Amino acid sequence: MIPRYTRPEMASIWEPQTRFKIWFEIEAHAADAQAELGVIPKEAAKTIWAKARDATFNIDRIDEIERETKHDVIAFTTHLAEIVGPEARFVHQGMTSSDVLDTCFNVQLTRAADLLIADIDKVLAALKKRAFEHKMTPTIGRSHGIHAEPVTFGLKLAYAYAEFSRARERLIAARKEVATCAISGAVGTFAQIDPRVEEHVAKAMGLMPEPISTQVIPRDRHAMYFATLGVIASSVERLATEIRHLQRTEVLEAEEFFSEGQKGSSAMPHKRNPVLSENLTGLARMVRAYAMPAMENVVLWHERDISHSSAERMIGPDATVTLDFALNRLAGLIEKLLIYPANMQKNLDRLGGLVHSQRLLMALTQKGASREDAYRFVQRNAMPVWRGEGDFQTLLKKDPDVKKFMTDAEIGELFDLGYHFKHVDTIFKRVFGAS
């Protein structure tokens, strides 16, 4: 988590003060439940809240204690005792460190997911707006990077909209997966604490009780969460890569907004590079990389070890902060994307009508030619055009084999660009709904 790629809204979730505040709330809510069950005095639970609810925890002091104890939760509860006083002896009754750490981690992950869902909504709004602006803007579709058949630029953006809609649903599911709480004691048996304490804390923290924990919440939940972030990052990169290709000088169908005073190169003043898209490509690699340790964290020894801990202290903040930044950058990129319909049309025309070859093939078979013959007739006229030697429609009209099946007028009708877009409305309704 470095400032260059960090937004304050997401960073605040992972700040030490936020973490200690959540730790306190977990401990205090547990004390409330213990008090209701008669395990600790009710006045003690009230005092814990009264003394520390609005406290600013002394991070330097906690660090000082941890240097001696070598244990972060003990360092925190020791500092909490300094704030609360004698009633602090009722804090952490029957609990283990993982109850606090894991429940806190899941609170942070769910809060991060809420921000990421809002980020995706920004991307979706930008994509929808630009898709409708260019719903019928003709452009060339490419397979293997080579001209294939016409599409519209609106369809390109609609593809991305559908992908990010799926990403949103996956993230909602991943949020639910980690929205669990464990207050079950040393090895998850509730030997020293009533399960009703867990139920109370879970409700208070906006979580669900973990059905069965060991000393930790099972890490397959977290693996799914971080894998989902990795998939979303891949969707970010897919769209960024599309923009990078479209901005190449010889293509130039779309271009990142270039602001006044912006410089593209320290050496070449003419340069306008797709730096935002390239940046997103690199950030996506990092988010995907964080999914790997999350997968490996699933494999813990027996009821618990802490091999997961060091990894999670890094991947939790880094993955969510990085993806949050990337999604917001992507939304802004799409909102300001420069789109060049004239260049799209010029590129459509570059191959002299070859983009209609499949329609010619189908028409010939419908007129009685075998598919093999029709393919041969069309291809032998297409190849000279591919080499820049003539116009496709003109060559077809001179081909005696083609003329056996079709008139010049019938051939000409097959070069209608609008034919390829007759179902755009249907696709848009599928993607965006009837509205």
Regions found by a protein language model. Give the residues of each.
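Short amphipathic alpha-helical segments with heptad-repeat character
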Residues: 110-121, 128, 158-161, 165, ...
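Conserved hydrophobic residue
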Residues: 40, 45, 251-252, 370
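A structural signal for small-residue-enriched, beta-sheet-centric alpha/beta enzyme cores
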Residues: 189, 209-216, 345, 361, ...
